[in-house]
């Protein structure tokens, strides 16, 4: 999984201007925090990894990478980001993981029966990210305008909904083996075909996934790959 994710990150992110010597004597810092959400009516645990240069380059702002399924994905993603940024393959990122161990389905998979868009608990989770989590991170940490969201299966599909807005809060999406919901291929293809925002989208699956996931992701890949829009940078990793 880690090797697989390294490939995805290299595809998604640009080459860093720093080299490994700049970061050699610096250490990463991790913070465990809690956000009290009015939308969710509960507390949510987050884990934050600060870039190695965060306490040295005090004027610098860093891309934010939000990791859904953070209870098991955070260490994979944050470790990969630190490794690749250390060697200068990608820029340093501030990584935040959102624990969804007991809330994964209600957070990401409650949809309207007709439109198949988020309702009730999933709509609330969407609002929590947009109106509470991101503002909290912006207020308390030095983050740049470029934000990436990472999800797997259910949360990977959920991450796509952020791209359906006129000015999406996330300009980068890493979609790992998404469980693609009804209408999502159509919604996503239509929106990305006409978007005026610069979007970086990376899609992945493998033959080790469930057959339905592999087939649906392959179909989505074909659809997105056919889009002719200079604002979309689309890459896929299917094997």
For the regions a protein language model found, what residue spans apply to each?
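Bacterial Sec-dependent N-terminal signal peptides
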Residues: 1-25
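A domain-start/cap signature at the N-terminus of enzymes
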Residues: 20-63
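Active-site glycine-rich loops that stabilize anionic/oxyanionic intermediates
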Residues: 62, 68-73
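Active-site machinery of serine-nucleophile hydrolases
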Residues: 71-126
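Short, hydrophobic alpha-helix immediately C-terminal to the catalytic nucleophile
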Residues: 78, 131, 160-164
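Gly/Ser-rich "nucleophile elbow"/oxyanion-hole loop immediately N-terminal to the catalytic nucleophile
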Residues: 111-153
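Primarily recognizes the serine-hydrolase "nucleophile elbow" in alpha/beta-hydrolase
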Residues: 145-195
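The feature captures the conserved acid-bearing segment of alpha/beta-hydrolase catalytic domains
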Residues: 181-239
């Amino acid at each position: 999984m880690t090797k697989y994710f390294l490939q995805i990150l290299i595809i998604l992110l640009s080459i860093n201007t720093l080299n490994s010597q700049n970061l050699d004597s610096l250490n990463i810092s991790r913070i465990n925090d809690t956000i009290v959400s009015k939308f969710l009516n509960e507390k949510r645990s987050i884990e934050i990894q600060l870039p190695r240069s965060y306490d040295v380059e005090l004027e610098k702002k860093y891309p934010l990478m939000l990791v859904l399924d953070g209870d098991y994905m955070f260490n994979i993603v944050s470790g990969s980001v630190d490794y690749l940024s250390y060697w200068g393959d990608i820029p340093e990122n501030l990584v935040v993981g959102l624990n969804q161990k007991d809330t994964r389905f209600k957070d990401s998979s409650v949809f309207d029966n007709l439109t198949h868009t988020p309702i009730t608990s999933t709509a609330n989770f969407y609002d929590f990210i947009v109106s509470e989590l991101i503002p909290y991170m912006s207020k308390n940490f030095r983050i740049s305008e470029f934000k990436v969201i990472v999800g797997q299966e259910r949360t990977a599909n959920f991450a796509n909904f952020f791209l359906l807005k006129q000015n999406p809060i996330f300009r980068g999406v890493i979609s790992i083996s998404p469980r693609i919901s009804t209408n999502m291929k159509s919604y996503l293809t239509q929106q990305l075909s006409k978007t005026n925002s610069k979007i970086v989208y990376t899609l992945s699956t493998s033959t080790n996934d469930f057959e339905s996931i592999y087939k649906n992701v392959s179909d989505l890949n074909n659809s997105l790959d056919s889009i002719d829009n200079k604002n979309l940078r689309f890459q896929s990793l299917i094997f």
